[in-house]
């Protein structure tokens, strides 16, 4: 599970309720709530390595930097690198700025031979084409609108496939937990027949 704009109390409560391991790296102080917030990775699998990636460029107006939270997870003896991501929004940054931020994540992912999952709020649909050009699969390409009129929440993968019997989609009911509709994908490593990883944001 990849979460964005969450504080320490929130991620602890969710992890405790669902009996999940987690890693959370706050990025900045929320401008109205005045609490640290940032992205988190939650998983039922053991977390063996973590890191915080500081993304380039400050958002216009707020002068805050975004970050990504990365975790290497041991899934049945195999490693998977997972990134929880929240790129700068459309009103505070250009498409080129978001591509620069994506490049920081892609460069870090290039250092591992593990399969990779990059999930979160990208504040863009077009950023998916950028990930595709970099060799990533885009299982959530067709999930539809995830906030208002926009499709901004996505999952990108390297070294993992979609099983024929499942795929990707979004949760219609959020019960007030977010203004976004979370997306999900069920993924398997090449050459396997059973689901190995279920990713959501």
Regions found by a protein language model. Give the residues of each.
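A long, amphipathic alpha-helix that forms part
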Residues: 96-114
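Structured beta-strand-rich core segments of catalytic domains in phosphoester-bond hydrolases
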Residues: 2-79, 167-169
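Metal-dependent phosphoester-hydrolase catalytic domains
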Residues: 72, 109-117, 122-201
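Surface-exposed cleft-lining segments at the edges of enzyme active sites
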Residues: 52-61, 86-96
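Short, glycine/acidic-enriched loop or turn micro-motifs at the edges of active sites
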Residues: 8, 89, 123-124
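Aromatic- and acid-rich polysaccharide-binding/catalytic face
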Residues: 80-86
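N-terminal, active-site-proximal structural segment of metallo-dependent hydrolase catalytic domains
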Residues: 2-17, 31-32, 99, 103, ...
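Active-site flanking residues adjacent to catalytic metal/cofactor-binding acidic residues
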Residues: 4, 85, 119-121
């Amino acid at each position: 599970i990849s979460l964005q704009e969450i504080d320490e109390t929130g991620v602890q409560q969710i992890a405790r309720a669902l009996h999940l391991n987690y890693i959370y790296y706050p990025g900045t102080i929320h401008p109205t709530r005045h609490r640290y917030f940032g992205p988190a990775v939650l998983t039922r699998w053991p977390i063996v390595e973590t890191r915080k990636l500081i993304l380039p460029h400050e958002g216009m107006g707020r002068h805050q930097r975004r970050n990504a939270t990365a975790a290497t997870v041991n899934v049945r003896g195999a490693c998977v690198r997972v990134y929880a991501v929240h790129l700068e929004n459309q009103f505070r940054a250009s498409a080129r700025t978001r591509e620069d931020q994506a490049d920081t994540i892609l460069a870090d992912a290039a250092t591992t031979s593990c399969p990779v999952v990059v999930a979160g709020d990208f504040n863009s649909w077009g950023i998916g084409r950028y990930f595709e050009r970099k060799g990533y699969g885009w299982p959530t390409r067709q999930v539809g609108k995830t906030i208002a009129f926009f499709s901004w929440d996505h999952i990108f993968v390297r070294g993992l496939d979609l099983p024929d019997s499942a795929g990707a989609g979004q949760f219609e009911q959020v019960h007030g937990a977010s203004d976004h509709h979370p997306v999900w994908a069920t993924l398997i490593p090449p050459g396997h027949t059973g689901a190995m990883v279920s990713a959501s944001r």
